[in-house]
């Protein structure tokens, strides 16, 4: 029984180290989302901080369209980060499923 507990503790520590490494990698990550066939692009960090917005000047005359495309590009980048985060955190936890509603990073 003690051997099993010690082994579980080692696995938990390794998983914690893997999660820390994955979180550090995600913090350095930059992802670009786009909309309108590339007329708008938004670059976010892994922490979803906006780094850059590029807008094709031809859409600036239509404010509503520009606003919609900026929001869509932001959402595209955000979804890409979510997918990358899920993939990296899944690898870090060795595929161990988290309870429903629990998200990483904690």
Curated annotation (Swiss-Prot):
Disulfide bonds: none annotated. Residues 81-106 are annotated as: Disordered. It is found in: Cytoplasm, Nucleoid. Keywords: Cytoplasm, DNA-binding. Transmembrane segments: none annotated. SUPFAM superfamilies: YbaB-like. Coiled coil: none annotated. One of its GO terms (cellular component) is bacterial nucleoid. Its main location: cytoplasm. One of its GO terms (molecular function) is DNA binding. HAMAP family: DNA_YbaB_EbfC. NCBIfam families: DNA_YbaB_EbfC. Belongs to the YbaB/EbfC family. Binds to DNA and alters its conformation. May be involved in regulation of gene expression, nucleoid organization and DNA protection. Homodimer. This is Nucleoid-associated protein XCV1128. The lineage of its organism: Bacteria, Pseudomonadati, Pseudomonadota, Gammaproteobacteria, Lysobacterales.
């Amino acid at each position: 029984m003690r051997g099993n507990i010690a082994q579980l503790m080692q696995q938990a520590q390794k998983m914690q180290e893997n999660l820390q490494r994955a979180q550090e990698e995600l913090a350095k990550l930059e992802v670009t989302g786009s909309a309108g066939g590339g007329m708008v692009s938004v670059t976010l960090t892994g922490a979803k901080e906006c780094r850059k917005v590029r807008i094709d000047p031809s859409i600036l005359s239509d404010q509503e369209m520009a606003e919609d495309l900026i929001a869509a590009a932001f959402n595209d980048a955000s979804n890409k980060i979510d997918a990358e985060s899920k993939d990296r955190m899944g690898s870090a936890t060795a595929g161990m499923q988290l309870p429903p509603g629990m998200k990483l990073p904690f």
